[in-house]
Regions:
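Nucleotide and nucleotide-moiety/phosphate-recognizing core
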Residues: 2-161, 169-185, 192-196, 200-206
C-alpha cells in the first residue's frame, strides 16, 4: 500500500564558503538554525524526513534523522543527493511513492509546499513537479517519484549528467507557483548579505 505523503529530503551538503566555512544549514537566522526552520516547515507535510550530507554524519546527530550520503562519488551535485534519497526510500520505506527535495539553505519554506506540488503534478499529468516563485523556477525544490531512480542513476553514472532541469525535462515537470512578495518563500542564503536579509524577513514574519 502506497502513501500520498512523500519522504522529505533536506539536501544539506552546501558549505558556507563565503561566510567563513561550515555547513550552511547550521547558520542561525532569528535565533534558530536554517536546518531547524527547514525541518519544522517540512515535517508536517511528509511521512518521514532524512538529511542528505557527505562527510561525518555525526554532525547532524542532534536531528535524530537518518543521514544519507551520496552513492555517486566526487560530489556530483544535488541530483546525487536526490538519487540517494530515492534509493533510501526504496530500501527503507517501500510504501512511499515520492520524495520531495529541498535545499538546506532555504529557511522560509511554505507550509503548503507538498500539497501544491502534488496538485500541480496531478493537473499537468506529469511525473515530476517543481516550485516557482515569481518568474524564477527552483528545480531542486521538487517532487520525485521513486520509480525514476534507475533512470537517474544511468544519467549520473553513464552520461555524467549534472543539471536537474536537463533530467527533469526528459520526464515532464509541472510547476507549482508562489508569489515572490512580500518575500520569496524560497529565498536562499549564499552570502552575508543574504543572511542579513533573512534576518529581516524573519523579523517581518514574527510580526505578521
Amino acid at each position: 500500500m502506497t502513501t500520498d505523503r512523500p519522504l522529505g529530503v533536506v539536501l544539506a551538503g552546501g558549505l558556507a564558503r563565503r561566510m567563513g566555512g561550515g555547513d550552511k544549514a547550521r547558520l542561525r537566522i532569528g535565533g534558530r538554525t536554517i536546518l531547524e526552520r527547514v525541518l519544522e516547515g517540512l515535517k508536517p507535510q511528509c511521512a518521514a524526513l532524512i538529511v542528505n550530507a557527505n562527510g561525518d554524519p555525526a554532525r547532524f546527530s542532534d536531528t535524530g534523522l537518518a543521514v544519507v550520503a551520496d552513492s555517486i562519488p566526487d560530489f556530483a551535485g544535488p541530483l546525487a543527493g536526490i538519487l540517494a534519497a530515492l534509493d533510501w526510500a526504496a530500501a527503507h520505506s517501500p510504501e512511499t511513492a515520492d520524495v520531495v527535495s529541498v535545499p538546506g539553505d532555504c529557511p522560509f519554506l511554505p507550509h503548503d509546499l507538498v500539497a501544491r506540488l502534488l496538485s500541480a503534478r496531478a493537473a499537468a499529468r506529469t511525473p515530476l513537479a517543481c516550485a516557482r516563485s515569481g518568474d524564477r523556477r527552483h528545480p531542486v525544490i521538487a517532487l520525485w517519484p521513486v520509480d525514476v531512480r534507475d533512470d537517474l542513476r544511468r544519467a549520473l553514472v553513464d552520461e555524467g549528467l549534472r543539471k536537474i532541469e536537463a533530467f527533469s525535462a526528459r520526464h515532464g515537470v509541472a510547476v507549482a507557483d508562489w508569489p515572490a512578495l512580500p518575500f520569496d518563500p524560497f529565498f536562499n542564503i549564499n552570502s552575508p548579505e543574504d543572511a542579513a536579509e533573512a534576518e529581516r524577513i524573519a523579523t517581518l514574519r514574527c510580526g505578521a
